[in-house]
């Protein structure tokens, strides 16, 4: 498998404020909100440093000891994350993005560009490739890693042409009877004036309609943030998978706190109330399956994460591909009709 690691987002540096006090270890790139990750980053960097030393029994023993400690602490921390901490993990810049899944899982991938109406949108990647022995269409949000790419990808926030490009590729998949895979990881659709002028709400609405009746299997995977309509625009699918530490919500916790309490500092409280974690979404019937992440999150072992997602995708495609189109569409309709239904309402019957 091929995996291109992102530029180091964290690094431990030695600093001394007065030249006399002992050197202080600090982690560059870890915000105060993300301090729960700090012990893990220290251990990872120490293991990497030891790995650069000449081979010796003592070095190997030290690496094994630190690795065991890292695994233990990772399991302890990540099994007790709050919804707000899971939100921060979902936004981690080293988590695999759509193109990382494409590079590892697919062969002969051909990316298609443009919506044939206005322009291309780099915030959404779309094309065709081969998963196992099956040709599939892939549509997914793509965030950037460095500043230049983040700007080019618009931080993973699609404009209307991105959703129209996505639909163009999905309609091609339907024409050639190929299943569709979508990868969701966005803070939301871009809300700028030019986006509104070109009809972002209409573009998303059309995608919801067309995906609801697309005559081929569709599987979505929420790999990081599932942000509001920006996620839904490629999220009307037969199966919705969520990585363990991904989130799916109608608005960000910060946005919710700003609207309800006029105070973004209450984002932690909002995250608790919104029930946006993968476990919550599974319990509510929004997600069909939660894919476990390695101890320490997807960013700690991207290849293992991508492999787990690939296995789940193949399993669901095998099942969905055996269904008649009419059965597939009826089940898709029933799935979304049940969402938000309470006992006693017509939709719950």
Report the location of each language-model feature.
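Intrinsically disordered, low-complexity segments enriched in small/flexible residues
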Residues: 22-135, 303-349
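Terminal peptide-recognition signature
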Residues: 43, 82, 138, 185, ...
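Short amphipathic, helix-prone segments within low-complexity/disordered or flexible regions
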Residues: 5-24
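Short hinge/gating elements
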Residues: 87-90, 151-155, 296-299
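A generic local secondary-structure boundary/capping motif
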Residues: 115-116, 126-128, 168-172, 207-211, ...
């Amino acid at each position: 498998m091929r995996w291109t690691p992102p530029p180091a987002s964290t690094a431990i540096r030695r600093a001394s404020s007065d030249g006399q006090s002992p050197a202080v270890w600090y982690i560059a790139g870890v915000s105060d909100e993300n301090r729960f990750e700090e012990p893990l980053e220290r251990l990872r960097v120490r293991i990497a440093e030891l790995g650069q030393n000449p081979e010796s029994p003592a070095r190997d023993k030290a690496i094994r000891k630190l690795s065991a400690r890292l695994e233990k602490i990772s399991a302890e921390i990540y099994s007790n994350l709050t919804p707000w901490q899971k939100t921060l993990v979902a936004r981690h810049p080293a988590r695999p993005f759509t193109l990382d899944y494409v590079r590892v899982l697919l062969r002969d991938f051909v990316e298609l560009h443009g919506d044939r109406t206005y322009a291309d949108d780099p915030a959404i990647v779309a094309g065709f490739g081969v998963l196992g022995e099956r040709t599939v269409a892939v549509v997914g949000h793509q965030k950037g890693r460095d500043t230049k790419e983040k700007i080019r990808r618009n931080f993973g926030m699609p404009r209307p042409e991105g959703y129209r490009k996505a639909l163009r590729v999905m309609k091609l998949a339907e024409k050639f009877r190929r299943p569709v895979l979508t990868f969701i990881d966005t803070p939301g659709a871009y809300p700028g004036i030019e986006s509104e002028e070109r009809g972002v709400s209409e573009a998303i609405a059309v995608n919801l309609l067309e995906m609801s009746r697309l005559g081929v299997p569709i599987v979505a995977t929420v790999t990081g943030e599932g942000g509001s309509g920006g996620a839904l625009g490629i999220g009307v699918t037969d199966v919705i998978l969520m990585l363990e530490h991904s989130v799916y919500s109608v608005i960000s916790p910060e946005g919710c706190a700003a609207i309800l309490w006029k105070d973004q500092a209450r984002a932690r409280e909002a995250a608790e109330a919104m029930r946006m974690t993968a476990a919550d979404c599974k319990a509510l019937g929004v997600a069909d399956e939660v894919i476990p992440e390695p101890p320490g999150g997807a960013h700690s072992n991207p290849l293992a994460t991508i492999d787990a997602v690939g296995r789940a995708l193949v399993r669901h495609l095998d099942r969905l591909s055996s269904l008649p189109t009419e059965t597939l569409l009826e089940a898709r309709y029933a799935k979304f009709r049940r969402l938000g239904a309470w006992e006693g309402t017509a939709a719950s019957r």
